[in-house]
Regions:
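Cyclophilin-like peptidyl-prolyl cis-trans isomerases
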Residues: 1-222
Length: 222
């Protein structure tokens, strides 16, 4: 093999490696960035025993609503304490302590997955309350298993739900990995209007172009 041939072979190998690396990066970005309502919040935080999780004393027979008053309007969530008691109690307890007040909804997805993600006090997608909630009420792996109006927990893997949650504004199919803990009974149109404005930099996944701040929260138990 001549020096020229060796040079050409080396160049081709370099191109193939670079191309493979680029493809891997692109695929990784798609999987991590758009592959679900995921985050990196508190992945290393301990999964708390049920007895140690915060509670709002909501029983399975109670009706409980969480009202998020945002700068875009009021969003009311009917919780599902019979199906996700640990999650409902933990989030209601956080809400009663004003944990969500003055926090932003930091993520909007607009292609394939249709959610607005909130609940991170840092607004970065990495924040959480310092504990993890066990998974509950996971849906079947079927089409549109997260229908419009669903409220579910974001996570960084099994058993890592903390305080971040997402509001589904259009029927969405996801892996059966996210605890469903409520339904939007009022304000879905607000989320849909926010979604219609898109992402701040024009992509399918990022901060919403219409800024959303949770100004206050109220828990109603009956």
């Amino acid at each position: 093999m001549s020096e020229q041939d060796r040079s050409n072979t080396t160049k081709k190998s370099t191109v193939y490696v670079a191309l493979f690396t680029a493809i891997a990066i692109i695929v990784g970005t798609v999987i991590v960035g758009i592959g679900g309502a995921s985050n990196t919040q508190d992945a290393s935080a301990p999964q708390a025993p049920a007895a140690d999780l915060p509670t709002a004393s909501i029983t399975e027979s109670n009706k409980a609503q969480i009202t998020f008053t945002t700068n875009q309007g009021e969003i009311i969530i009917e919780t599902l304490p019979a199906l996700a008691p640990l999650t409902v109690n933990a989030l209601a307890a956080l809400a009663q302590k004003n944990y969500f007040d003055n926090t932003i909804c930091h993520r909007l997805t607009t292609e394939g997955i249709f959610v607005l993600q909130c609940g991170d006090p840092t607004g970065t997608g990495t924040g959480g309350p310092g504990f993890n909630i066990p998974d509950e009420n996971l849906p079947e792996p079927i089409e549109n298993n997260y229908p419009a109006g669903t409220v579910a927990m974001a996570n960084a893997g099994p058993g890592t739900s903390g305080s971040q949650f997402f509001l589904v504004y259009q029927d969405t199919t996801l892996g059966p990995d996210y605890t469903i803990w409520g339904t939007i009974t009022s304000g879905l149109e607000i989320v849909q209007t926010i979604a219609s404005a898109g992402v701040i930099e024009g992509g399918p996944d990022g901060a919403p172009a219409t800024g959303v701040t949770i100004e206050s929260t109220k828990v109603t138990i009956s």
